[in-house]
Every structure is written in C-alpha cells, then in structure tokens.
C-alpha cells in the first residue's frame, strides 16, 4: 500500500533545501525510494515540519513592524483640491452662521442652495406641533407659575442687589454662558465671582445705553439692526452681491443705520459734483482729496464758477453744444438749469 500523502508531496518539486551541498531540485517517483538512505525523513515528520514552518512564517508576518514609509500620502494636486474643499466648507459655514456672502460668487451661492434643496428633498425634517395649552388663561397661569419658581432661584440670590437688574430667567440661562466666555478666565467650572462680574458689567452697559437713549431721544437699537448694517457695510466694501433680504431692507428704508450709509454716499456725491459744500474732506483720503481738488480747479479754469459749480449741468451743456441729442428719459434739470446769459464755453 502506497503512501498517497507522500506521493503528493514527492511528485511536486520541493523548495530549495537549507544546506547548499544538497541538490537544489529532485523528483521522487515513489515514497519508499531510498528509505534507508541517510538523512531520510518520514512523510509524517516532514508534514509536521512544514506545518511548523507555515505557523512560524504566519507569526513572522503577523508581528512584522509597521513601515510608515508605505503609508499613502497625498500628492500636490490632491493637497490643493483638499485645501480648496476645506476653504469652501468654511465659507459655507460662515454664510449660514452670519449671512456673510462677501467671499461667495453668485455661482457658489446657487451651488450651496442646490445642495440644501437636495438634502431637504431627500431627507425632509419631520415637524410635530403639539398644542400645549388649551386656552390663553391656561398659558397665563403657567407663565405666572414659572415666574414664581424662577424668582426663587439660587443663581439670582447669589448676585449683589446693586448689579442684578435682569430677570431670573436671564440669570439662569443667558448670563452664565456670557460669564463663562468672557469673565471666567478660561476655567472649566463657572465661578460666582465671574458671574457677579459679568452681571455688574452688563448692568453698567445697559444703564449707559438707557441714559444715552433718553438724552438723544433715540431708542436703544436692537442687535439685529446693528448686525444688518455691519453686514451691509461689509458687502459694500467687498463689492459683493447683495442678498435679496438686504436689498429689500435698503429699499424699505426702515432701518436707520442702512439709511445713514446710503445718505452719506449720496451727500458726498452732491458735495463733489453738484455744487455742495466741502464736507467731503473728512471722508476722502489724501489721494482722492487731491484728485477732487485738481478736478474742481480744472473745471473752474475752463468756465466761470457760476457755470461750473454743478459739474453735471456743465458736462450736459457741453455735450449738448457738441451736438448730443438729449434722450427722452433724461432729467429735465439738465435742460432747464442752464444760465440765462449766453456764455461761450470752450469745447473739450
């Protein structure tokens, strides 16, 4: 009876032997050949050795040290695109947090809105409205009960009486967050001293704003109005596209700060070109101030002061004398404000 396992291993070329004196390749056709030869190993023993060598090789592979040089790295092109994506995500976050569109082009805004619409369409948010109060009387009783409960809070009692001008709900919710951010010195736990200092500083600020409002006969501006004016000014300085909500706010003229910005720009134009005063000196920098003074001197040299005070009318009359036909939508002031006396003006 032949050894089938032995025939299986012996009919295939074995790996190179350990010692160089032995032949590199050998083919055995029978498992019983050279049984008595020196150095002969039975098949079972050889199988055990092969299993042991396999386990050793497996262990050596398992405990092989980690080669950091084989770790995949980003090339230059992928790094550039990665930085662009991160920068674009930061712009999107800034756009949704503070409505800052100064660094976004109309195409980028359209792309952001498209992504938002796709997310809403694919995964809409479920909104459940629960009617908590059956009538207005029930709601009023609930608010009275909350006022009594919040009036007995420990946070309100820990503050000095001269600095606690806020309601208890404000002290329990908003004031600790404000004190933690600005008056706690970076500590993890909020201290009573930081809470008291924040309340004192806010009290002084509100008292000052109230006194100034009463003196100037102007109500205290809401933070929304001030933030809207700041966003509007930022967009103007960046030459960015105004969003629809700010455009409607400008057209409505319901926000005093935005009206002041627009009125200031229009007043500067009137002072420069329509015969106004010299108050624009405070607004312009030295370079533009020198330009405007040179322009006014050159125009005054070309025509008398009575004719060149209003540069718009002066240029319109020069164009009309040169043969330009006024359009049907042109303002009538350009046609009727010419001087009654005939003044010969040189053509530019």
Curated annotation (Swiss-Prot):
Post-translational modification comment from the UniProt entry: O-glycosylated; contains N-acetylglucosamine side chains.
Classification via InterPro entries: Baculovirus_Gp41 (IPR006790)
UniProt entry tagged with the keyword Glycoprotein: yes
A GO-annotated cellular component: virion component
Presence of the UniProt keyword Glycoprotein in the record: yes
Keywords for this protein: Glycoprotein, Late protein
Entry's Gene Ontology molecular function annotations: structural molecule activity
Family label: Belongs to the baculoviridae gp41 family.
Designated name of the protein: Structural glycoprotein p40
């Amino acid at each position: 009876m032949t050894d089938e396992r032995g025939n299986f291993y012996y009919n295939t070329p074995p790996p190179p032997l350990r010692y160089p004196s032995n032949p590199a390749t050998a083919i055995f056709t029978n498992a019983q050949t050279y049984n008595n030869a020196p150095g002969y190993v039975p098949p079972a023993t050889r199988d055990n050795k092969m299993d042991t060598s396999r386990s050793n090789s497996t262990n050596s592979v398992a405990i092989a040290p980690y080669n950091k040089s084989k770790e995949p790295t980003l090339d230059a092109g992928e790094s550039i695109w990665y930085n662009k994506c991160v920068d674009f995500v930061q712009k999107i976050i800034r756009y949704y947090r503070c409505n800052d569109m100064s660094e976004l082009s109309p195409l980028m805004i359209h792309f952001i809105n498209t992504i938002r619409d796709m997310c809403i369409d694919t995964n809409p948010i479920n909104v459940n409205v629960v009617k908590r109060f059956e009538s207005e009387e029930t709601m009023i009783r609930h608010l009275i009960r909350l006022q009594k409960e919040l009036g007995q809070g420990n946070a309100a009692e820990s503050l000095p009486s001269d600095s606690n001008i806020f309601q208890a709900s404000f002290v329990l919710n908003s004031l600790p967050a404000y004190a933690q951010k600005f008056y706690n010195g970076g500590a993890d736990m909020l201290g009573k001293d930081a809470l008291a200092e924040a309340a004192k500083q806010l009290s002084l600020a509100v008292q000052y704003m109230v006194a100034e409002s009463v003196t100037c006969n102007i109500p205290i501006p809401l933070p929304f109005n001030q933030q809207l004016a700041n966003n509007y000014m930022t967009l103007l300085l960046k030459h960015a596209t105004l969003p629809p909500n700010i455009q409607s706010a400008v057209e409505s003229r319901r926000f005093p700060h935005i009206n002041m910005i627009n009125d200031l720009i229009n007043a500067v134009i009137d002072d420069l070109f329509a015969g106004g005063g010299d108050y624009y000196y405070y607004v312009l920098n030295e370079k533009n101030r020198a330009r405007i003074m040179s322009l006014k001197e050159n125009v005054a040299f070309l025509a008398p002061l009575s004719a060149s005070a209003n540069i718009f009318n002066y240029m319109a009359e020069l164009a009309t004398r040169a043969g330009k036909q006024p359009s049907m939508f042109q303002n009538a002031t350009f046609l009727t404000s010419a001087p009654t006396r005939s003044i010969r003006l040189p053509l530019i």
